[in-house]
Amino acid sequence: MIQTYSTTIRRKEMDAVLTCMVDEKIGPGELNTRLIQLVKEFFKCDGAVALRSPAIALGYALTALELEKGSKVMISALAPAWQYQALVSYGYVPEVLDVNENDGLVSVDEIKNGIENGGKILLLHETEGIVPKFDDILELGVPIIEDISMSAGASVDLGELDGVGSERNGNDKSIVDNRKKVGSFGVYTILGLEEKDVITAGG
């Protein structure tokens, strides 16, 4: 049987794990600092925080957005289970949106329905690395938390996005060769490094 997800760990990464164990240090260290710097350089963002899990990151993002407890957060029906579980545990109400059968993404019409039903924030999961049409979604004006755990490294041709052109992103450092990386469209971005994500970490 061919596994859909197959995590790997290289000798260099194993050596890093062993080094941490030998150092007998608990808490943020050199590797944590290097990871943050790499993320900032790759995504051309001004700030990043390394946390143990994407669920913890989601909690901080919702707190930063000052979302009231009991508010509805829109998520994809194909979103990983941790998103639903985390929202419930933090006191929010998941508004599950159906997906398009052709690409597995939430449609703009479905997001509109979610907003009409009281959805305050869109937690945008880019299923299996498939990138949505950001132009139409951004026009809705709803705050977006992008989950790029499965799409990290992908980019969008700005020539295909009429509303996300130079007038909106003239000074955007994330735009290179008229392409904009996923993770730079939302208010906050979550990059999970779990075993089924596109980039995995050793824990």
Each language-model region and where it sits:
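Short active-site oxyanion
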Residues: 46-48, 71-72, 120-121
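A short beta-strand submotif of the Rossmann-like class I SAM-dependent methyltransferase core
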Residues: 50, 75, 124
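Conserved PLP-anchoring active-site segment centered on the Schiff-base-forming lysine
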Residues: 59-114
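Conserved PLP-binding active-site segment in aminotransferase class I/II-type PLP enzymes
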Residues: 1-64, 68, 90
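Active-site phosphate-binding strand-loop segment of PLP-dependent enzymes
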Residues: 102-201
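Conserved donor-binding loops in enzymes that form glycosidic bonds
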Residues: 6-7, 77, 127
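Hydrophobic residues at beta-strand termini and immediately following loops
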Residues: 51, 97, 193
